[in-house]
Amino acid sequence: MNTEVQLPTVPAFMEPLLPQGAGDFTWGIKASFRTYFERLPDHAYDLSGGAEGTESGGFRFPGRGAPTRDENGLWVIPFSGRLVLTAHFGALSVLIADPEVLVSPQGGVSLSAIVDEVEGRAARMVIADLAFEGTGGERLSPEANFSASLARDGQYLFMGNYYAGDPLDPAIIKSQPFPQE
């Protein structure tokens, strides 16, 4: 009888993240949405908890620890920070906080975040489906690059203006820098 425990395989893009955790998650949401939003006279970005804007117009969320497994067997890559977009005198309000990249044992990848869409209370939901596109970055600080599309639940985040499957901006997970030898 074989009593050897089979450990679940880890997608290749996660290997650099396991020892020390993700460095940060960068995502622009959707460029056309940002263009529309920034034309509104009362638009405001409120970034806190470590979230920051990037030179390209996207947003960076810092890592908050090494990936873990949840009760369903998903790898959870956690990030921190809060982004709130408001305009139209408060009628437009989008919250994206403490994003998590979820990786299934079969390799499916999605993005969840705390949003303000369930009966006016913050709740976590999957907002984007991610597809691994390859690696980049520097040798001591590799990156995993993803294309993104709007998830079924994510369409509610944008008040029905975009639909499940619509393309979103690409996403990048950057690992913590490896120590120099």
Regions found by a protein language model. Give the residues of each.
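Predominantly extracellular/secreted and cell-surface proteins with exposed
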Residues: 57-118
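Extracytosolic secretory-pathway proteins
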Residues: 8-56, 60, 102-181
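N-terminal acidic, proline/glycine-rich, low-complexity intrinsically disordered segments
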Residues: 1-7
